[in-house]
Curated annotation (Swiss-Prot):
Belongs to the conotoxin A superfamily. Keywords: Acetylcholine receptor inhibiting toxin, Disulfide bond, Ion channel impairing toxin, Neurotoxin, Postsynaptic neurotoxin, Secreted, Toxin. Expressed by the venom duct. This is Alpha-conotoxin-like Br1.4.
Length: 13
């Protein structure tokens, strides 16, 4: 999952 490019998930990536 590439959550690092989306919203709040990017904060902990």
């Amino acid at each position: 999952i590439t959550c690092c490019t989306r919203g709040t998930c990017a904060q902990h990536c």
